[in-house]
Amino acid sequence: MDSIISAASVIAAGLAIGLAAIGPGIGQGNAAGQAVEGIARQPEAENKIRGTLLLSLAFMEALTIYGLVVALALLFANPFNS
């Protein structure tokens, strides 16, 4: 029974980090593309666009870090083992 719990924890950790990276990865690509397009249209607004982009990228990256924390908790501080 303990080996089943360990195997399920490893699979869940892999899914947690994998799924946590997909959404922010797509979002970061879209945000960067739109920022480049906005800077190309309005070069004078480059500083404002860049600041907003960096802030939004940090928020998106936080989601991936939360997934990593969950995966590490499942692997090393496994709450399912007694």
UniProtKB/Swiss-Prot annotation:
- Keyword NAD among UniProt keywords: no
The subcellular location is: Plastid, Chloroplast thylakoid membrane
Q: Which residues cross the membrane?
A: 4-24, 57-77
Q: What is the protein's membrane topology class? A: Multi-pass membrane protein
Q: Does the keyword Transmembrane apply?
A: yes
- Which NCBIfam families does the UniProt entry name for this protein? ATP_synt_c, PRK07354.1
Gene3D superfamilies, alphabetized: F1F0 ATP synthase subunit C
**Protein's UniProt name:** ATP synthase subunit c, chloroplastic
Other comment: In plastids the F-type ATPase is also known as CF(1)CF(0).
Q: Where is the site labelled Reversibly protonated during proton transport?
A: 61
Alphabetical list of InterPro entries matching this protein = ATP_synth_csu_bac/chlpt, ATP_synth_F0_csu, ATP_synth_F0_csu_DDCD_BS, ATP_synth_F0_csu_sf, ATPase_proteolipid_c-like_dom, F/V-ATP_Csub_sf
Give the species: Thalassiosira pseudonana
Any matching Pfam family: ATP-synt_C
Give the family, as the similarity comment puts it: Belongs to the ATPase C chain family.
